[in-house]
Swiss-Prot record:
Keywords: Adaptive immunity, Cell membrane, Disulfide bond, Glycoprotein, Immunity, Immunoglobulin domain, Lipoprotein, Membrane, Palmitate, Signal, Transmembrane, Transmembrane helix. GO terms for cellular component: external side of plasma membrane. The keyword Membrane applies. The lineage of its organism: Eukaryota, Metazoa, Chordata, Craniata, Vertebrata. A lipid is attached at C210 (S-palmitoyl cysteine). Integral membrane glycoprotein that plays an essential role in the immune response and serves multiple functions in responses against both external and internal offenses. In T-cells, functions primarily as a coreceptor for MHC class I molecule:peptide complex. The antigens presented by class I peptides are derived from cytosolic proteins while class II derived from extracellular proteins. Interacts simultaneously with the T-cell receptor (TCR) and the MHC class I proteins presented by antigen presenting cells (APCs). In turn, recruits the Src kinase LCK to the vicinity of the TCR-CD3 complex. This is T-cell surface glycoprotein CD8 alpha chain. Residues 25-139 form the Ig-like V-type domain. The chain crosses the membrane at residues 189-210.
Amino acid sequence: MASPVTAQLLPLALLLHAAAAAGPSPFRLSPVRVEGRLGQRVELQCEVLLSSAAPGCTWLFQKNEPAARPIFLAYLSRSRTKLAEELDPKQISGQRIQDTLYSLTLHRFRKEEEGYYFCSVVSNSVLYFSAFVPVFLPVKPTTTPAPRPPTQAPITTSQRVSLRPGTCQPSAGSTVEASGLDLSCDIYIWAPLAGTCAFLLLSLVITVICNHRNRRRVCKCPRPVVRAGGKPSPSERYV
C-alpha cells in the first residue's frame, strides 16, 4: 500500500500532467480497453516510449467511483518487483517483459477489480502518466417493455351521464335496434315530460279547490214584495 504522502501527491501529479498528455503519448498500451468476465485472466501491457525514462514502471488503479484516488498496485524494474502489501500474488502479479515493456496480470477477474488501470514512469525528474485502460464487465442490455395499449374504462352506473339529448348513446354491450325503446336514452326524454304533466295537474287541482272555497252562495228563495203602503203583509214577512 502506498504511503499517505504518496496517496495525496498522486492526484496532484495527475492534474499537473494533464497539459502534457495533450501531446504525443509517451506510452503504448495494449489493449486500450478490456471487457472482462468473472474468473477470466486479464493481462495489460505498458510500453514506455521515453528514451530518457528511468528504469522501472509503476502500475496504478483507480475505481469508477466519485472522488476515487489512484491506488498503488506494483512497481516493476530490472532488479525487483514490488507489489502492494495487501495484494495476493496469486490474484495480481506483474513482470518486466523487455527493457521498456511491462505487464500486469489479473489472474481471476473479480467484480471489485472493475475500474481504470494505468502506468507511470519518471524521466528527467518529471512524473509521466499513461492514459487510462478501462476494465469492466459486459454491460447487461436493458430491455424496454413494450407500451401497453390504452384500455377503455368500463361504463358503470355510478358514472355521471350527460342529460343532453345529443350525448345520449346506447349503453355498453347493448345492440342498436331499428325499433323498440332503449330505456337508457328514452328515460331522459320521458322523465322531464312526465314531471311537467304532474306539475300542471297539481296546479289545476289547487286552482279548482281554491275557487270552490271562495265561491259565493246564492239564495234561491224569492224576495218579499213591497206593496203600495210600504209594508209587507203578514203572510209575506217570512219566506
